[in-house]
Amino acid sequence: MHLSQLLACALLLTLLSLRPSEAKPGAPPKVPRTPPGEEVAEPQAAGGGQKKGDKTPGGGGANLKGDRSRLLRDLRVDTKSRAAWARLLHEHPNARKYKGGNKKGLSKGCFGLKLDRIGSMSGLGC
């Protein structure tokens, strides 16, 4: 378990060091991301009542489709990475079930049958 935590920390530090710093003076300021529903809804509202058959100069419809697919792809990658981190940090979802094992151990009688409590305590099981 300690080894997996050490690897997770090392991976996190590596990812943070590779990530471009937001404090660089030449970098443009980042615009905060809006929820996916709002971002997709705004360009459709700006288009007005245009139909699919209407052509706009500059191919605005293709750009909208590309933005939407890029947004969906980014969301899918984010979900996959979160699932990977959850698996890494929590080795098994029911780890408590498997960690303890049996506290008292299975008391088996002469014929391999589990003894009841009275039989195991008094020795009358065999």
UniProtKB/Swiss-Prot annotation:
The cellular location(s) given in this protein's UniProt record come to: Secreted
Q: Which GO BP terms apply?
A: angiogenesis; blood vessel diameter maintenance; blood vessel remodeling; c-di-GMP signaling; cellular response to glycoprotein; cGMP biosynthetic process; chromosome organization; cumulus cell differentiation
Molecular-function GO terms, alphabetical: hormone activity; hormone receptor binding; signaling receptor binding
List the keywords (alphabetical).
Answer: Cleavage on pair of basic residues, Disulfide bond, Hormone, Osteogenesis, Secreted, Signal, Vasoactive
Q: Does the keyword Amino-acid biosynthesis apply?
A: no
Cellular component annotations (GO), alphabetically ordered:
extracellular region; protein-containing complex
Compositional bias annotation for Gly residues: 46-63
User: Which residue intervals are annotated with compositional bias (Pro residues) in the record?
Assistant: 26-35
- According to the UniProt entry, where is the signal peptide? 1-23
Primary location: secreted
Q: Does the keyword Signal apply?
A: yes
Q: Where is this region: Disordered?
A: 19-72
The UniProt entry, under Pfam families, shows:
ANP
Q: List cystine links.
A: C110-C126
Which positions are listed as propeptide?
Answer: 24-73
- Identify the InterPro entries for this entry: C_natriurtcpep (IPR002406), Natr_peptide (IPR000663), Natr_peptide_CS (IPR030480)
Top-level taxonomic group? Eukaryota
PANTHER family according to UniProt = C-TYPE NATRIURETIC PEPTIDE
Family recorded in the similarity comment:
Belongs to the natriuretic peptide family.
Name it: C-type natriuretic peptide
Per the UniProt record, the source organism is: Sus scrofa (Pig)
